[in-house]
Amino acid sequence: MFQNNPLLAQLKQQIEANKEYVEGTVKASDKAFGFLECDKKSYFIPPMEMKKVMHGDKVKAVVKREDDKEQVEIDSLLEPMLDRFIAQVRFNKDNKLQLIVDHPSIKNIIPANTHKKVTETLESGDWVVAQLKTHPLRDDRFLFAQVTQFICKADDNFAPWWVTLARHEQPREPVANEKSYELHDELDREDLTSLYFTTIDSPSTQDMDDALYIEPIKQGEVQTGWRLVVAIADPTAYIPENSNLEKAARQRCFTNYLPGFNIPMLPRELSDDLCSLVPNEKRPALVGYIETDLAGNITGDTRFVSAWVESKAKLAYDNVSDYLEQVENAWQPESAETKQQIDWLHQFTLARIEWRRNNALLFKESGDYSFELNEDGSVRDIHVEYRRIANQMIEESMIIANICCAKFLADNAKTGVFNTHAGFDPKNLESAQKFLLDTLSTDENRDALTAFYAPEKLATLEGYCEMRRSIDEFPEKFLELRLRRYLTFAEFKSEVAPHLGLGISHYATWTSPIRKYGDMVNHRLIKQVLLGKQAKTVEEGILVRLQEARRQNRLVERDIADWLYARYLFPMVEQAVEFDCEIADVSRGGVRAKVIANGAQIFVPFSTLHDKKEEMEFRPEEIALYIKGEKAYQIGQAVKVKLTEVRLETRSIVGNII
């Protein structure tokens, strides 16, 4: 009798029209309930509704109100949190396969089966890749997954590496070596083997991209400048443009440098041998001749040639730095020619540093952290290394070489893989100006600084550089760290554009073609120009892949480091070790502090900082926490932190500020 009843249909429409729908992301709690995080509000999800979803699911829900209390009833799934995911194996009491998702906030235990292509016998604790097959909201069935790939056994000490690489779908192995490699030369090679090229690198480095030769330019007996000859390994001479090797390099894009070892972009026979500029071996190279005056200004156009070169010496950063810094009992150059090259390159470097200080931007000095590992993958120690003068010598040589490459490609090829950085995100320009004025201005100088930090000026290369130089002497770190949050990301582009982070109008890397696919592309473009050919515009797909691969590699490096830090600090919890730290972030949940000595990040929950929540205020615009109206903690602030907990299963490190 109710079938096709228009009154009933109208009633249903009215009920539906009166429902208040919201969309958001599920946030699980330590209890059975959860929250739906929407754009401007958070709604309570009762335990029965949480059984339909998991942390991270994007859902549509209906708001229910009763006695001034709000909660939601889940309506439908918009996007599941899980698709492909990493998990550890477990078996229930009936020996049925289940998966523990490797995510700190997902507590769901997911029943699973195994795809037929997985041939390993799974045991409790093993690491696997799985695919979510069913979801209660989407398939009207309970959560269920399928194991699609075995990663490693539970007791594999190298699990941090293998699991992380699998998570980000990165290869474990280098590209397989070819049976043989042939040199494909279209350009005649000049014989430059008589020039006294040297390399400066880490003692363990095998894939040496660059070698340098430098000499003074003289008019009569008076020196007027420097001639720097930059020899760069030439892998494109061995790799035909549409070969399988080229395709593999294009997919990987970068050599992946991980704690303990690297995964090269090219086969090791090329990266570590045939292309590497090892000492006393004749190698093909692409060579750039760069000339400057004594103040470091580039004079004239850079000349590129295809050549044969022979490095005469492989030098180590620390040895060269010790020699130049006159450390007691320091290493000494083994020949007069090596000594001359080091001394000349040192003088050239000092001129270029001063040139960049006045005309571009210098890097802020910060240490690089490196893990010293035992053979079984355990962490023996963590070292902080700072750039010394020898590192700066190579750095300055590579920077000027890349500036010259960018100008050459822009002028001649009209395309390239250009490294660009627009500085502040356009939507943050006014916020950046306001922050600078609030921090630096006084009643006397506010009008002048308002013009100096005008948004339209901050958006230009000149204005951005002037701003950065103006804050160089500011003693508080928070100014620099806060401004970083307003920046946009660096991008690869096929047309030349400024790199505001470097303070340079043109920048394109070509100095690491063994390690970076974009540099290989630029090598091919330089060669096309030298051959008199019309250069092909760099495909957008290449730029997109470079951007994605760079992001993936950074995530891989970060995730492995997080795991190794947790392992390293875990034994120290009982000792309640205290660390000197710097606040790296302040968020709604707490403070994240970086340990100065080793780079580990320790989370300090807000609940440990003050016992009255209502007296605490997080101010995101300052990245600061206020207690009772007074600023208590801010990004960049020095603090002392006591280690209190390390959770190995989630790789989280927790402490208290003391």
UniProtKB/Swiss-Prot annotation:
This is Exoribonuclease 2. The gene is rnb. HAMAP family: RNase_II. GO terms for biological process: mRNA catabolic process. It catalyses: Exonucleolytic cleavage in the 3'- to 5'-direction to yield nucleoside 5'-phosphates. Its EC number is 3.1.13.1. Its main location: cytoplasm. Residues 576-658 form the S1 motif domain.
